[in-house]
């Protein structure tokens, strides 16, 4: 039933995207048009092209699908948390609302950062494609790149939430995380490089740096939660 609710939320989000498709398409292609307009040496006019009569429809459905998934993230996170709740104790269950709100806010923050980074990433990629190379982008591939960037950044920003959760349920301690912080940061940069679809250093750093900062915030929250738990149960020290 939880899967059905999540799929229904995706479907509703997709319908909303289809109704306002032109506005969303303009929004998604704005970064590409921006770099073309301010960099005439890039030899592009901001126009996307379709290879065949079906590709335009395919791009429309991709935008609807990806957009529906992004819009449904709050519902999906809530359903996932409700699935985990039975395995939690009473003390852990009280974190439900803060976890959901934080997860949604961080996902949206990550997605927004991806969109803001997109023109910088495209500028880097176009520059490194070489002088005199005319830039003409296929609409379906461009839309997939934008969508995967947003999803990658959004999911990347959720990793600290997972770290906090694992500390609260006792799977890992903040002391262990802080001792291994160098490996954690290395893992953060490797993860950023792995999930960034464009593969450019601009996007990788734009994701890795805030993820690293959020890692330390997550560890700090773990220490605070550990101290509060020790005060509630002094005999457990």
Located regions from the model:
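Membrane topogenic/interface segments and analogous intrinsically disordered interaction regions
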Residues: 1-237
């Amino acid at each position: 039933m939880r899967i059905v609710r999540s799929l229904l939320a995706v479907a509703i989000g997709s319908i909303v995207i289809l109704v306002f498709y032109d506005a969303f398409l303009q929004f998604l292609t704005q970064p590409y048009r921006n770099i073309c307009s301010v960099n005439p040496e890039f030899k592009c006019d901001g126009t996307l092209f379709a290879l065949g009569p079906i590709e335009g429809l395919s791009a429309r459905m991709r935008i609807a699908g990806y957009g529906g998934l992004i819009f449904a993230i709050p519902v999906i996170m809530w359903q996932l948390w409700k699935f985990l709740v039975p395995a939690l104790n009473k003390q852990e269950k009280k974190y439900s609302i803060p976890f959901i709100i934080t997860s949604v806010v961080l996902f949206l923050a990550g997605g927004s950062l991806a969109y803001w980074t997109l023109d910088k990433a495209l500028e880097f990629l176009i520059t490194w494609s070489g002088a005199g190379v005319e830039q003409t982008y296929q609409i379906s591939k461009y839309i997939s790149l934008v969508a995967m960037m947003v999803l990658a950044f959004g999911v990347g920003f959720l990793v600290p939430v997972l770290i906090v959760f694992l500390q609260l349920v006792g799977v890992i301690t903040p002391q262990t995380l802080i001792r291994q912080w160098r490996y954690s940061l290395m893992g953060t940069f490797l993860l950023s490089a792995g999930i960034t679809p464009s593969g450019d250093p601009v996007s990788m750093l734009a994701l890795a740096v805030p993820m690293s900062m959020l890692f330390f915030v997550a560890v700090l929250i773990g220490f605070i939660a550990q101290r509060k738990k020790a005060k509630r149960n002094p005999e457990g020290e």
